A protein has these predicted regions:
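Extended, charge-rich low-complexity regions and/or helical-solenoid scaffolds
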Residues: 39-40, 102-104, 108, 150-151
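Conserved Class I S-adenosyl-L-methionine
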Residues: 86-117, 123-124
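S-adenosyl-L-methionine
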Residues: 1-39
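Core SAM-dependent methyltransferase catalytic element
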Residues: 103, 119-152
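A short SAM/SAH-binding and catalytic strip from SAM-dependent methyltransferases
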Residues: 44-58
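A short glycine-rich, Lys/Arg-flanked "PGG" loop and its adjoining helix->strand segment in the class I
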Residues: 59-71
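Short, contiguous acidic/charged loop-to-helix segments that flank catalytic cores in large enzymes
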Residues: 37-38, 52-56, 82-91, 136-137
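Conserved beta-strand signature within the Rossmann-like core of class I S-adenosyl-L-methionine
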Residues: 72-84
Length: 152
């Protein structure tokens, strides 16, 4: 892969989720040991934080995650479902749960925080000393989805 960004002697490439999963799933052609199995490159856990709503196609990401997690492994997630512009399938939390279950995940924990969490340096404040006139009436917030799912 050719570096996408460089500064002086430092360069780096940002891989997509699909590229990272492909590395985990690729066969090791140099290994002729018949005692190895298909779970050599699988992981015991995947943790996604403020991530899944960046998917263009969440169905693909759920299937990929299922493919890279070893049997008995878990997927832990926390973050909003504020789908980015490039999302072709912006699903609700309930729809996402159905997708996970139909893909073969067992849901161990599932919750949506009841209180919204503000972000983007909101000007909204309840600090004493600020008048209502100086407080913004607009703020960005989300209620994070938290789940733990296990691959049987």
């Amino acid at each position: 892969m050719k570096p996408q960004h460089s500064t002086g002697t430092l360069s780096y490439t940002i891989a997509t989720y699909e590229q990272v999963a492909a590395i985990l799933l690729e066969d090791d052609d140099d290994d002729d040991d018949d005692e190895t199995d298909d779970t050599n490159h699988l992981v015991d856990a995947v943790v996604t934080c403020f991530f899944i709503d960046t998917a263009t196609n969440i169905y693909d990401w759920v299937a990929l995650t299922h493919d890279i997690v070893a049997p008995g492994g878990v997927w832990i997630n926390v973050g909003p479902l504020q789908w980015h512009r490039n999302a072709r399938l912006p699903v609700t939390a309930n729809q996402l749960r159905m997708i996970l279950e139909r893909t073969g995940w067992d849901i161990l924990e599932w919750s949506i925080d009841p209180e919204p969490i503000e972000y983007r340096n909101s000007q909204r404040s309840t600090t004493s000393g600020r008048t209502a006139a100086t407080m913004s009436t607009h703020f960005d917030a989300y209620c994070p989805l938290r789940f733990v799912a296990r691959k049987p």
